Amino acid sequence: SIEDHFDKSVELELELEQKGKLDLLEMVRNISNMINIHYIRQKEPNGLGHAIHCAKSFIGDEPFAVMLGDDVVDAEKPCLKQLIEAYEEYHTTILGVQQVANEDVDKYGIVEGKYIENGIYKVKDLIEKPDIETAPSNIAILGRYIITPEIFDILENTKPGKNGEIQLTDGLKKKKKNQAMY
């Protein structure tokens, strides 16, 4: 697990020390000091919206980033940096999006939006995994977000949606009624 990857590995450290691989030993020891990671476990798989809500007490009243591990983004400027810059300009929830093939829209949350500038869309609507025939666009949410903390109260009152889970897209759709989203 990711938790174990960034944790100390006493067995590995001992082996490297015994074999005299001191450069590697120093690298391994430094891994756990590179970043601070806090883990909040979702006790049962009730959807992404539920997973995010589980972090409410940790996040508090701050905007936060969500970065899903099932999408890899290869961009000249890192995706998270782009989202932060957009947040700093618009001071509201920001969704990372990408165009997908029309036949793939049923695999993603899809955005209906108005193009503003420099890859920025103002969100008009969000649909979680729409039918190919009814999708409003092929602009897909790609699993990168900056979200403002108002989402927590919304998720708390969001009924389970597709697959009986609390969907983040459903919560964002409610949030969009009271706050612009890009």
What does each model-identified segment do?
Residues 65, 85, 115-182:
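Catalytic-core segments of class I nucleotidyltransferases/pyrophosphorylases
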Residues 4, 33, 57, 174-177:
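Solvent-exposed polar/charged
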Residues 1, 46, 146:
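Short alpha-helical
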Residues 2-10:
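Glycine-rich loop at the start of a catalytic domain that most often binds anionic cofactors/ligands
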